[in-house]
Amino acid sequence: MSGRLCLDLAGTKLWRRSLRTELLNSPSDMGRWMRQAELLDDPGPMDTRGLERVRRLREAIYVLVRAWPPGDDPSGAGFRDALAEVNDAARLPLPRHQLDVSGRLTRTGGVDEVLGAVARDAVDLLSSAQFGKTKECANPDCTRLFVDVSRSGARRWCGMAECGNKHKAASYRKRKKQQTVMET
């Protein structure tokens, strides 16, 4: 949906300005996200300490993406703490990828390897030209981030099924209501 692994992780907390919805409520939610993100085939047992580490990295990524580029005066200790969190995690090992004789890929590792992969993706994004195409959803309540790779660079929504269709439907209802008022 977002176009980047690090932004997918940042998107596991929704509606940050209003109804704050946590998608990583438990270690099993975290394991499911790791599988869906194709980081690990079998994350194995997860614990609350690992969950907290993943959430901490997620929040650091969100802070950095919203405040980047920092310019001459990084905005306070929160920014510096977030940068340190991402840089520390980027030094961790990556998931191990292996092919078997049939060509099947297996991805193994644990929380450290997932943190390493996500943090490196964040470092890559923040230091690349692609960062200039990073946007926040145009829905005022939605705080999902994405990379706009559309040809025109005019993508506005995190996803049509999520926010785009809701906005279009609301606009349609508003136009119909105004049209009805004008006709009476």
Language model features with spans:
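Short, cysteine/histidine-rich loop/knuckle motifs that typically chelate Zn2+
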Residues: 136-141, 160-162
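Short acidic, gly/pro-rich beta-turn/loop elements at beta-sheet edges
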Residues: 20, 147, 168
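Short helix-coil boundary/hinge micro-motifs
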Residues: 1-136, 143, 181-184
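Basic DNA-binding region of bZIP-type proteins
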Residues: 162-179
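Histidine-centered nuclease catalytic patch
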Residues: 143-148, 152
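Cysteine-rich micro-motifs
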Residues: 153-164
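Residue-level signal for short amphipathic helical patches enriched in basic/charged
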Residues: 129-132, 149, 164
